[in-house]
Amino acid sequence: MGNIKKWLPVISLTFSTFIFNTSEFIPIGLLTSIADDFAITESKAGLLITIYAWVVALASLPLMMAFAKTENKKLMLSLVALFTFSHILSGFSNSYVMLMISRIGVACSHAVFWSIVTPLAVHVAPEGHRSTALSMIITGSSIAMIVGLPLGRAVGLMVGWRVTFLLIAILSAIVLCLLAAFLPKVPSDNNISLKTLPALVTTPALLCIFVMTALTITGHFTAYSYIEPFLGQAAGFTNGEITMVLSAFGVIGIIVSVLFSKYYDRHQFAFLRVAVLGICICTLLLGISSGNSFIMVCTCLLWGLSINCFNISLQSCIIDYSPFGTAIAMSIYSGIYNVGIGAGALVGGIVCSHIGIPFVGYVGGAVSLISAMFFLLTVTSVLKHSKKS
């Protein structure tokens, strides 16, 4: 990878994606513990995921437009500082409302963070290593699934979920120091206004990406938001086995990152097909697989492969197909992604409350099937004819 000093900014950003991704999904692994502690239902605890996602969805574009001209290092440090403070508040939450408020603070930092981190990593990476920088950012997210989420869940089960949030606060403070030391100043290049925004949003390729993202992520999170109680109640897994399955999602993510850096440039549509069709198939198979532990684990591994392919491929597509204002386009993508998370968690909660946890996969799979059909019939042809020069 050449001189390690040239990679320190990207490495620091990779650590930041690890900590942000750990925080984003930590309530999924602690859903039962939080529900028991506050004497609420799991579906109500799931609102921590839903409202978080909706805040990100609603705030991403307005906040990114508001800070579009802010120098990137200054903006990144401010975001991580807010993130750290909000987790301290989470760790000392003595009520469900206080925890929700703290999570809204995290969501506001998240809203801008994911809009700038990928374009920033590409910008500060050594010349000619864009795919490697992108794969490193996704690797940070994947390691969060391997280490951060399962470890946070294990800590939460042993000494309480509040300690998990405080540990995240400590780690984010360390990340803040790394970014302050190694991230160079990067002037903003977002020359976009409210007048030019519609032209960006209505770009055919981006419009297809946004619609496909909303459908796919809604289907995915209808099931994934409740994967912990699903594996425990429907599949009969123990706490230790659930933690291992959650870790497997991240292990697969690292494999995808390596494959992406080597093969994506030549096989873009193969990655997209695996992503969209794989999510559809796996969510539909969840209910059927729950009766056999081996098949259940295999389904989850393929599911992890598919969602990681989706995440890394779609971020690359945003960069490739944005005619201008890449960070703004990424903020729209992030917002829509979180609409999908929120909608999925909400739909999954309704399914859990009125039909039963074993059925979240079938409902999520039905939504994912619509996305798969849209991809096969429309998205592929539009992307092939819209490649940005």
Where are these regions (language model features)?
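Helix-to-loop junctions at the C-terminal end of transmembrane segments
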Residues: A59-E71, V256-Q268, C352
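Helix-breaking motifs and short loop linkers at transmembrane-helix boundaries and internal kinks
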Residues: A39, E71, F92-M98, S109, ...
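A late C-terminal transmembrane helix in Major Facilitator Superfamily
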Residues: D320-I357, V363-G364
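Helix-loop-helix hairpin linking two adjacent transmembrane segments in secondary transporters
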Residues: M98, E127-L183, Y226, F230
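Paired small-residue
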Residues: S86-L89, V97-G105, F294-L302
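Cytoplasmic helix-loop-helix junction between adjacent transmembrane helices
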Residues: S102-G140
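Conserved MFS/SLC helix-loop-helix module at the cytosolic interface between two early adjacent transmembrane helices
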Residues: L58-N94
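C-terminal transmembrane helical hairpin of 12-TM major facilitator-type secondary transporters
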Residues: A270-L314
